[in-house]
Amino acid sequence: MAKIKDDCIELELTPRRYQELDDDPFILSVFELLENKKAVVRDFSAVLLESEYKVLISGIETMIKGNQDSISLETIEPFLFLSIDQENGNYRIKIKIIFDDYKESKSNSNLFEINCNEEKLESFVTALKLNLENTKNPSKLP
């Protein structure tokens, strides 16, 4: 599981598959966001495109190499905007989550920020890359 956190906010993003259709571009995922160790979002059925993972991974790797100052990603399920900015060797991850309130026919959004150093970001992207590779050959359930 790929986790990154600072003193207040923790993000976990883990691609997983129990069965795979070869032509299915979606990856069932775990998306969890904690604030002060309390769940803000805990979605065990998040669905992200494989291309979204690849854009995120390659963008972070490019930032770490110093060839890019920022990246952004917008996902559908859950509906969120994720951006990472780099300044003076420090990284700021912004996560904006859109919540739909079907009872009142409106949307609410919350913005969360994680501040980290290069080592934490590199650990996150390494774990995310490994998790994505492991979805290609999922373990068989009994």
UniProtKB/Swiss-Prot annotation:
It comes from Bacillus subtilis (strain 168). The lineage of its organism: Bacteria, Bacillati, Bacillota, Bacilli, Bacillales. This is Immunity protein WapI. Induction: Constitutively and highly expressed on solid and in liquid medium, with or without biofilm formation by 12 hours of culture. Repressed by DegU. Immunity protein component of a toxin-immunity protein module, which functions as a cellular contact-dependent growth inhibition (CDI) system. Neutralizes the tRNase activity of cognate toxin WapA upon expression in E.coli. Does not inhibit WapA from other strains of B.subtilis. The WapA C-terminus cannot be expressed on its own in E.coli, however it can be cloned in the presence of its cognate immunity protein gene. Cell contact is necessary for growth inhibition. Unlike the LXG toxin-immunity modules, WapAI mediates competition under shaking culture conditions. It comes from the Bacteria. Disruption phenotype: A double wapA-wapI deletion strain is growth inhibited when cocultured with wild-type cells. When wapI is reintroduced it restores growth in a cognate toxin-dependent fashion. Growth inhibition by wild-type cells is strongest on LB medium and less effective on media that promote biofilm formation (MSgg and 2xSGG).
